[in-house]
Design a protein with these regions (language model features):
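Positively charged n-region of N-terminal signal peptides that target proteins for export
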Residues: 1-4
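Bacterial N-terminal signal peptides
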Residues: 6-15
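Cys-dependent protein tyrosine phosphatase-like superfamily
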Residues: 18-185, 197-291
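Ser/Thr-glycine-rich phosphate-binding loops at phosphate-binding pockets of nucleotides
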Residues: 190, 194-195
Length: 291
């Protein structure tokens, strides 16, 4: 009897021990990732994300919307707190020329121009403000080019050769960066599609699973949704445009990731086959940016 009781107690102790060793599921919240900028939208970091038994180092990997209106205070913050050493600009040439980046301190600037057909103003059409641009998108919500953007934007990013070349340049430069010299910052116009895809690829290279990649992408929706709910939409097509082009649409993004998996097996395989990021390069990135 005593021996049986002893065995039961031992099993209970083992069970309790196992339970206390379980890693709690990480809770990804927008407020925890924001980096304190007031003059740039969707400004956050990848730092703090748990990947297996390791985590991404804080204050090194920053992602934002355009920084063409960066305030003096925010520029100082990026210099003093984050020591930003390099800016990666994924906006198209026309976007960058019409609203040049405000470069914090002596940060190096690299243009990684990526534009979509009809997504940037290569014509004579100019918008005085974002409200005017939003109004135009909603007005032409049923136009084939606008609808194509809604359904195939991420396919263009992941599968078009010109887009892949842009992300090859991103990783090639990132591999030259020394974390001890400070953070890197990448952005596009809204910091959700081109910059968001860069974040997804980098997270995959660092060993993140689909759940974390999607959680990070969805933070853009969490950021923009409070703004878009104030904008009136009258049709389902307008709602689709609002959710995809002005906010962020995780469903459309994940559909592209599913296509990547179907064709290449995984996002990491895609990185190796299409972007040229070898397993050895991934190890370098993990050693630099994980702790």
């Amino acid at each position: 009897m005593i021996r049986t009781l002893s065995i039961i107690i031992s099993i209970m102790v083992m069970l309790v021990s196992c339970q206390t060793n379980v890693v709690e599921e990480q809770k990804i919240e927008l407020k925890n990732q924001l980096i304190g900028l007031t003059s740039a939208h969707n400004a956050r970091q990848l730092g703090g994300y748990q990947i297996g038994s390791r985590r991404i180092k804080d204050n090194l990997l920053l992602r934002t919307a355009k920084i063409s209106e960066l305030s003096k205070e925010d520029s100082t913050l990026l210099c003093d707190k984050y020591k930003v050493q390099c800016i990666y600009d994924f906006r198209g040439k026309e976007e960058s020329l019409s609203a040049p980046d405000v470069i914090p301190g002596k940060a190096r600037y690299l243009s990684l121009a990526l534009s979509f057909a009809g997504s940037e103003s290569e014509s004579d059409t100019k918008f005085e403000n974002e409200q005017q641009m939003i109004g135009m998108l909603l007005q032409y919500a049923d136009h084939p080019s606008v609808q194509a953007m809604c359904t195939s934007m991420y396919d263009v990013i992941f599968f078009e050769e010109l887009s892949q070349e842009v992300y090859r340049q991103f990783f090639a430069d990132l591999l030259t960066v020394k974390p001890e010299d400070g953070a890197v910052l990448w952005h596009c116009t809204q910091g959700k599609d081109r910059a968001g895809s860069a974040s997804a690829m980098l997270l995959a290279a660092l060993g993140a699973d689909r759940e974390l990649i999607m959680a990070d992408f969805t933070l853009s929706k969490d950021y923009y949704d409070p703004m878009t709910t104030k904008i009136k939409t009258e049709t389902e097509l307008q709602k689709t445009v609002m959710n995809t082009l002005i906010s962020a649409n995780p469903v459309v993004f994940e559909a592209t990731l599913d296509k990547v998996d179907a064709k290449y097996g995984s996002l990491t395989n895609y990185l190796t086959e299409c972007i040229g990021v070898t397993p050895e390069m991934m190890d370098v990135l993990r050693n630099r940016f994980l702790e």
